[in-house]
Each structure stands twice: as C-alpha cells, then as structure tokens.
Amino acid sequence: MARNKIALIGSGMIGGTLAHLAGLKELGDVVLFDIAEGTPQGKGLDIAESSPVDGFDAKFTGANDYVAIEGADVVIVTAGVPRKPGMSRDDLLGINLKVMEQVGAGIKKYAPEAFVICITNPLDAMVWALQKFSGLPAHKVVGMAGVLDSARFRYFLSEEFNVSVEDVTAFVLGGHGDSMVPLARYSTVAGIPLPDLVKMGWTSQDKLDKIIQRTRDGGAEIVGLLKTGSAFYAPAASAIQVAESYLKDKKRVLPVAAQLSGQYGVKDMYVGVPTVIGANGVERIIEIDLDKDEKAQFDKSVASVAGLCEACIGIAPSLK
C-alpha cells in the first residue's frame, strides 16, 4: 500500500516542524515546497538524516515548483510573512493574500483532491480566500486555529490547577485573533466544568478571567518573547493533529476554522467552531448553545472576521 503524500507549502519554522512531526508519526511521505531555493531541500535532507535515529520510514523531498505537490492527500499551508513584534495578524493581510492566490492556483492545478489545512495569518480571512482561489469544496479546506487556541487554554488551566493537560478539555470559538471566545462553561477538568471549579474554590473568577485573556494574547506573548518570529512548535503540532484525524479517519472532535452555512447564524464565512474531522474532511459542524454574553462575544468575533474578508475583496475583487 502506497504511503500518504503530505505537501507542506512554506518551509519556514512551522513548515520544518510539520515535516519532522509527520515523519515521527509516520503519516506519510513529505514534500516541502518553498520559493526559496535550497531551503526545502536542506530541511528535507536534514529531517531524512534523523530518520535512522528516530526509526521512521518516510521520504522527504524539497521543491521549488508546485508540480512536486501533485496528487497530495493533505496540503498544509504556512507560506506567507510571519508576525513580528508590534504587528497584528491583520497587518499581514495584503502581503499574505497575494501568497494565498498563488498557493490556491498551485493546489487547484496539482492537488485538487487534497484535504487542505491553512495556518497562514490572518487565519480566518486567509483560509476563506484560499478556498475561493483553489476552488476546492469547503469541507476539504479548514483553518488551523481552534486546536492551537484550545491547547493554549488547556495548558494554562493545567498550570493553574496543577493537573495533567490530558485531563483538561477546552473549547475556543470564533476568529483566531484578539476577539476569540474561550468558553469557560464548556471547558472542564476531569469532566468538571470550570464554573463549578470556581465554586469549589479551586480557583477564582479573577484568575480564570486572566487565563482567558492570556489565551487571547497567546500568540502575541510568544512574538514578544522571540522578537524575531512567531510560534511554530504548537501551531505545527495542532495542524498535524487535524491532518492525522483526516488521514486515519479518526473522527476527532476538533475546533477548526470551517465554512459555516447557517450554523451560529453565519453563512459563507470561515469561523472557528467544533467539528468532526474524518476521511471526508469536515464531516459535521457541532452547533453548541451559547448564552447571551457568549453569543455577543461570538458575534463580535464574526464581525471582526467579516471586516477582514471585506478588506480582502477590496484588494482582490475576484473573491466577491
């Protein structure tokens, strides 16, 4: 049986980490694509040379031409400019939209049957544009955001409660930005909802509110510390989790940016929601009940994403 083929568009820090994780998990053969000559070839060779040590069998190919991604089962897109200190995800819009147009054309021509995961920021607008540029069906194109945001939320909660991250579940809805909506009511430790843990005296509402804000600022916190780049380990791990659920038909319930068709009162936009990811891509969108305050926060987040999509149309009218 032939191995799966995983194409990585962009061979920067996230791209290289994705390739390494795909190898370690033996998800398939990997093609690293980048416009910079030598970078994908060098990273591919470096990772391949680690395979005898780590004991995985996979082929790693570096390429500067989209023809190399032909027939890919999964395409993960990280191409574009990363955030730098003082930049918002939105500042990247104009630059990265042009990149998405080129990437979309490459996928459309060479990997039209692939499941596509977009990581490029500003995430919700970029995955929306990428789906349009590529012409792929919406259930085969998602944005990696909620898995990462939820992972950050889970980690911060595990620190606060001094428990294993495995026993913490958390959901973050909405856009991948400052307006994201971490849902305390639907987040648990060993099945116990966070509001109940506050009542039990495990933490205070004030501490919980600070953790929620830190989750919203999670990407910016790392950008500020690194000074020369943005997060790459956690984003790569999050995207690989989504890819693995698709390739192995695991049907994991994962929060991703998916195109909504009326759920949550939203149509034809990509917003972070809980989904079931299996061999058919997005197999189900889970619509959870939101209280008045949660709905207001979610609507605000959706409005922020809508503004970015409008800005995209201003730059590339063909998206309309």
Curated annotation (Swiss-Prot):
Protein origin, superkingdom: Bacteria
CDD domains: LDH-like_MDH
Residue stretches in coiled coil: none
Single GO MF annotation: L-malate dehydrogenase (NAD+) activity
Keyword NAD attached: yes
PANTHER family documented for this protein: L-2-HYDROXYCARBOXYLATE DEHYDROGENASE (NAD(P)(+)), L-LACTATE DEHYDROGENASE
Protein name: Malate dehydrogenase
Organism for this UniProt entry: Brucella suis (strain ATCC 23445 / NCTC 10510)
Taxonomic lineage from the root: Bacteria, Pseudomonadati, Pseudomonadota, Alphaproteobacteria, Hyphomicrobiales
